[in-house]
């Protein structure tokens, strides 16, 4: 058999990936299968060449789909540009740049005639999606004229390599296919092929290909997160929209193109199978239009049927995996709240061949596994073959059901408008519990039908017609505006009052914000303002709770500390719709005093101003008691800035854009002051990247805190007090530490040092009890501040803080975490009491919403520890799911601990989780400044 030597080195990859600029019509070459000695043997090509358009095998160094080969984004991008030149079925458009500055490309594929009329079809999609002002007759006319718009993405999770490698084949086949199905489907659809993580593909592919010997290639030991800040959590950002890539995708989905189907491709499939395809397991979110769920199930079933008809076994659905439609915020789930079908597939495979495992029960056909697959060797090309079939199934469904898909988008949007214009009631698990309690033991499970009116359909239980945000009652107005901007970035209509108005006897000023539920994206509006009520899911009565796929409660208005009025009756207001992203009302300098400036502590943006002042060598103070300034009362922690030419310039330049007021006063406010000092923050990370650390890195950058990333080796060897004032250990930053009452994390696998480039070897290592903990304790005793969050609170205990975990069993001195049957609280929003006179809580309200996720709370056991945030009720649940929430009562969620001359701040509540809870950011930010300011106290 003929042997072909593979190209070696990244330089060869880049050269080969960009040198081809003209179409080739070459004889069909073999798809390379690489042997252990680095040579390849011929096999049938995945995609044969067609004259006029360059085939993948003729462009890339090796055909994508070859064992032990990955194309990177540079090559992928170059190939898209070439296809754009060669085919009249494709139009290539940039839809933004990534966090690392790469261009995100979207290949729009359809017939030449459709591509010539994209603006018309885009307008049809928009009008049907938004529904407002479109009658049913007009909707049917538009649906008859329009084209189904389908989004198919690749590469969101960069180590899930099948999707990008397969997408080049999908594109080529669609651009060159002359078969009846291709021509029919392209005529009836507009296909949007987007790459959603270019930075990650470049990192992962280059890392994988860096070794010459194919069998040594791996991407399991990549050195950092494959999205600059969020890693795998780039698929948890869709409602918050913090990252550039998320904003780019959301703009296409909800503000420009409004696809009716969003197909988000992932890995990996269930063990002993090939691919997960919907239908999903329950629960589905109660805010969703039922039609979006039935259509998602319908399309998923069509995908299974296509695979089965082609003899491709191993597709599973429903309970074969944990995926559900409960959680908003993912690329495929946020579409549900916008009346679009969201398809997730999770397929096995990668450039390194693998084996399908033999799982005995998966050899028996059933409704959620219609065609089992036997154990066998599996190659990347096999996954790409399945990907082509699944893509074809989605496209064919959209084409065959074009008018229905388009019209149903309007129907669901109009449902939202109509439901938001009348009295409606949503049934949740809590309502079912109330019906059961009111009905007693009903015959065959039924209760008195009259209870529907007396228990459920009461006036006070009606769903909201809208929400009003009064700018004058916000503790942190810029954060509230940021919340509104997340809605706008998700296509929600937000209105701004042009003049004062009154609703239900309450007077609202001009500039108030109104979000009505009578709009197409009503499900998303409700999901962001209203509490999630997750069912109590168990396999059997009294059994352990079943873990949700992601968090159970996440109401964003609660997390961001937004004060809003929930209006249950129809109302009108003199408003105009916001046409783009809002800016917070400009802050002002109030008063004419010359001694200095007083700024409230309530707005997170005050930390940006503080950090700018500190960077300029100016040292503000926090005043320990409330302050009166120009007729306003500012709470404890108000910021005092003595006047100077430099300070005045910084304050006056900053307050306007930051949306915070500064009071110019004639004398320093009375009361004790805490002088702040410049801080040097060390943010602890690990080789491979810790997602919570990445999110925190993004957060620190937004609020202009100076910081460095520090790794375990440096913690073990450097003079920590000479380099840092604060060390931050986010959740999972120290997974090898153990402490009674916590579930063990365990070590993450790390590569051998000699296999890692020199500049990255310092990233290796672990935080250990034997070496690292004593050095961190010494750092704190000498005046350093240690911040621990989530599971990293094990470190706080090991440092000797006089606190103990509260959510534990203690049997004969043996302390263990509570079993899930005794306490279970997957990511949810809880209400907590705050000690606002503690500097750690300056700027906080006395009662606050905090995010908590199956973590640990504390009991203070000795002097030197102060409780700052407490769960003070039998059931603090605000949004989500809590099993035995009474276990939390009177336990501490945040504690302030003295340790020698330094501080330890332990956060059981996840006060920064995924950069969402703006309402608790200041608990974290305060710690970064308060600890160093109090260091060396008597």
Where do the protein language model's features map onto the residues?
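Divalent-metal coordination cores built from histidine and acidic residues
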Residues: 189-236
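Intrinsic-disorder/low-complexity accessory segments
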Residues: 33-189, 230, 236-237, 242-244, ...
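Intrinsic disorder/low-complexity detector
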Residues: 11, 22-25, 394
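Feature marks short, surface-exposed loop/turn motifs that line or immediately flank catalytic pockets
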Residues: 199-200, 269-271, 351, 735
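C-terminal segment of classical bacterial N-terminal signal peptides
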Residues: 17-29
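Hydrophobic, helix-prone linear segments
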Residues: 271, 328-329
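Short, solvent-exposed turn/loop segments enriched in Gly/Ser/Thr/Pro and often Arg
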Residues: 193-197, 208, 264-272, 792
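Bacterial N-terminal signal peptides that target proteins for export
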Residues: 2-14
């Amino acid at each position: 058999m003929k042997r072909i030597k593979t190209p070696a080195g990244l330089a060869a990859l880049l050269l080969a990936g960009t040198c081809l600029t003209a179409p080739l019509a070459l004889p069909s070459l073999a798809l390379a299968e690489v042997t252990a000695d680095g040579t390849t043997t011929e096999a049938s090509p995945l995609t044969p060449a067609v004259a006029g358009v360059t085939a993948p095998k003729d462009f890339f160094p090796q055909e994508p789909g070859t064992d032990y080969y990955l194309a990177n984004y540079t090559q992928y991008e170059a190939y898209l540009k070439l296809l754009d030149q060669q085919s009249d079925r494709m139009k290539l458009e940039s839809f933004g740049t990534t966090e690392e500055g790469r261009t995100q490309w979207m290949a729009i594929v359809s017939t030449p005639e459709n591509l010539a009329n994209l603006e018309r079809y885009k307008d049809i999609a928009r009008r049907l999606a938004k529904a407002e002002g479109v009658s049913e007759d007009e909707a049917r006319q538009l649906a008859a004229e329009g084209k189904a718009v389908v989004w198919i993405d690749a590469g969101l999770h960069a180590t899930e390599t099948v999707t990008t490698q397969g997408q080049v084949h999908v594109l080529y086949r669609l651009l060159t296919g002359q078969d009846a199905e291709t021509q029919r489907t392209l005529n009836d659809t507009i296909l949007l092929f987007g790459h959603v993580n270019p930075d990650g593909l470049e990192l992962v592919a280059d890392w994988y290909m860096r070794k010459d010997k194919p069998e040594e290639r791996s991407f399991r030991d990549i050195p950092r997160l494959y999205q600059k800040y969020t890693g795998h959590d780039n698929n948890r950002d869709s409602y918050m929209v913090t990252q550039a890539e998320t904003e780019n995708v959301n703009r296409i989905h909800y503000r420009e193109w409004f696809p009716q189907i969003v197909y988000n491709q992932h890995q990996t499939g269930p063990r002993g199978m090939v691919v997960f395809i919907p239908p999903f397991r329950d629960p589905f979110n109660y805010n969703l239009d039922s039609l979006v769920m039935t259509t998602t199930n319908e399309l998923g079933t069509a995908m299974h049927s296509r695979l089965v008809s082609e003899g491709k076994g191993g597709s599973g659905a429903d309970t074969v995996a944990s995926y559900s439609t409960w959680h908003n915020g993912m690329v495929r789930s946020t579409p549900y709240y916008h009346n679009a079908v969201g398809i997730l597939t999770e397929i096995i495979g990668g450039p390194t061949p693998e084996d399908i495992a033999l799982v005995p029960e998966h050899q028996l056909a059933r409704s959620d596994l219609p065609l089992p697959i036997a154990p066998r060797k599996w190659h990347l090309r096999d996954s790409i073959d399945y990907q082509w079939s699944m893509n074809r199934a989605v496209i064919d469904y959209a084409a065959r059901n074009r008018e229905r898909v388009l019209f149903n988008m309007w129907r669901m949007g109009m449902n939202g408008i109509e439901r938001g214009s009348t009295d409606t009631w949503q049934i949740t698990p809590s309502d079912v519990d109330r019906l059961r309690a009111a009905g007693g033991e009903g015959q065959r499970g039924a209760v008195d039908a009259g209870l529907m009116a007396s228990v459920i359909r009461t006036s006070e239980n009606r769903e909201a017609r809208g929400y009003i945000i009064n700018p004058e009652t916000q503790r942190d107005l810029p954060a509230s505006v940021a919340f509104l901007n997340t809605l706008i970035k998700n296509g929600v209509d937000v209105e701004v009052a042009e003049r004062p108005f009154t609703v239900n006897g309450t007077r609202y000023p001009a500039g108030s914000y109104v979000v009505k539920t009578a709009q197409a994206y009503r499900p998303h509006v409700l999901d962001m303002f209203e509490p999630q009520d997750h069912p109590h899911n168990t396999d059997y009565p009294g059994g352990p709770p079943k873990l949700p796929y992601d968090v159970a409660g996440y109401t964003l208005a609660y997390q961001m500390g937004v004060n809003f009025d929930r209006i249950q009756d129809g109302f009108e207001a003199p408003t105009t719709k916001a046409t783009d992203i809002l800016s917070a009302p400009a802050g002002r300098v109030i008063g004419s005093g010359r001694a200095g400036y007083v700024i409230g502590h309530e707005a997170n943006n005050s930390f940006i101003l503080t950090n700018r002042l500190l960077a300029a060598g100016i040292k503000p103070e926090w005043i320990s008691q409330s302050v009166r300034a120009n007729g306003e009362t500012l709470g404890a922690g108000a910021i005092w800035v003595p006047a100077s030419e430099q300070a005045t310039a910084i304050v006056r330049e900053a307050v306007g854009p930051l949306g915070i007021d500064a009071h110019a006063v004639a004398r320093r406010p009375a009361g004790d002051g805490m002088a702040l000092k410049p801080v040097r923050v060390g943010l602890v990370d690990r080789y491979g990247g810790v997602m919570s650390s990445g999110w925190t890195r993004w957060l620190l950058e937004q609020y202009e805190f100076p910081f460095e990333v520090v790794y375990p080796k440096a913690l073990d060897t450097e003079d920590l007090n000479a380099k840092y004032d604060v060390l931050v250990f986010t959740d999972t930053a120290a997974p090898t530490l153990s402490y009674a009452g916590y579930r063990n994390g365990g070590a993450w696998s790390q590569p051998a040092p000699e296999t890692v480039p020199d500049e990255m070897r310092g990233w290796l290592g672990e935080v250990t009890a034997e070496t690292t903990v004593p050095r961190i304790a010494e750092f704190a005793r000498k005046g350093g501040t240690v911040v621990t969050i989530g599971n990293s609170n094990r470190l706080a205990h090991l440092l000797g803080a006089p606190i103990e975990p509260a959510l534990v069993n203690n049997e004969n001195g043996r302390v263990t975490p509570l079993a899930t049957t005794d306490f279970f609280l997957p990511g949810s929003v809880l209400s907590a009491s705050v000690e606002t006179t503690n500097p750690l809580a300056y700027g906080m309200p006395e009662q606050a919403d905090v995010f908590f996720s199956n973590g640990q709370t504390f009991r203070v056991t000795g002097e030197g520890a102060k409780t700052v945030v407490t769960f003070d009720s039998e059931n603090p649940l605000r949004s989500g799911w809590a099993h035995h929430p009474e276990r939390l009562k009177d336990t501490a969620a945040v504690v302030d601990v003295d340790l020698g001359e330094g501080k330890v701040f332990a956060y059981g509540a996840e006060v920064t989780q995924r950069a969402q809870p703006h309402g608790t950011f200041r608990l974290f930010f305060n710690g970064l400044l308060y600890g160093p300011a109090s260091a060396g106290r008597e």
